[in-house]
Amino acid sequence: GALTGVMVPYGLKFLWAPLLDRYFPHFLGRRRSWLLISQVILLISLYAISQFDPVAELSTVAKIATFIAFFSATQDIVLDAYRREILTDNELGLGNTIHINAYRVAGLIPGGLSLYLATIYPWETVFLLTALCMLVGIFMTLFLAKEPMIAQVDRDQPFYMVFWIPLKEFFQRKGVAQAIGFLLFLFLYKFGDSFATTLQTKFVYDMGFEKEHIALVVKSTSLWASISAGLVGGVIMLRLGINRALWVFGFIQLITIGGFIWLAAFGHFDQIGAAELWKLGFVIAGEYIGVGLGTAAFVAFMARETNPLYTATQLALFTSLSALPSKGLGMLSGYLVKAVGYYHFFWICLFLAIPGMICLFWVAPWNEKGNEKA
């Protein structure tokens, strides 16, 4: 309904990312200035949404929520660019992993707290307290390290060039064939993995598990498995380098899809006991270990392939493209499950993970010179 398009800005952030590379206030530098602006606007917007009744004024709430999503996506663009610019290539693996895990854990605090407070306090109070959480980010932004000096985008060029030049630079730097292969890899590397998890909650329900099992096993296990794997993966990348990590972690990511195949082979559980919960926990832990490892290497690889002059634009484009399998094609998974069943669906997901691994021969060879490591 009215809330359907709220998350659209996250998929389209590459459209305004070039403006963040070209135009910026000078009081805190190219990245920190936009970061502070977006955070202040988010604080005000979260307060504003608390002033409207979500039942009687749903349309207004949806519009403000979309506005919040826009500036939240803007904050993501700037943070991605800032992180790339302050980290050396051999620090990208661990640095990006720490950021991703901090993002996950930080989301639990206002998110979990808000859900709890919603059972006690009215909507207005809950969102006001959520808005106040933004003060932490605003305070930290003021004390962030200054990003390195980078040559600025030419502001005298025609406006449309701000969108064209970052794309042109990428294709010239990589070569047309290599650039197309790289973009194809972004789409394919996590395709099978993302496709497999799009219906994860429905699959667990259909296997006979209940809401309390999802809360107890799925949510907690997936969070800590992905966080632990991401941190371990970041450290391993310091030794392996990004290219080799893509190979090793990608293979683990592929194999762990097999856990869903194994679980689906049991069919619907008539009774849920300790054995069934252990099976579920084992599969979820394995899958999210693969997710954590694969994401750590994948995000570091995308960051490494950007030009510092156009970091925001190119990273926004890369991340938007890489999200297509889960956000765009994920809607097809329901039809596929209905046609072939879960067991065969997860086999299809496993095979869909193979083309991304094949692309590694071209985009990230195992012994390529410049496969950075500490």
Language model: regions and residue ranges:
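Helix-to-loop junctions at the C-terminal end of transmembrane segments
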Residues: 12-29, 228-247, 337-338
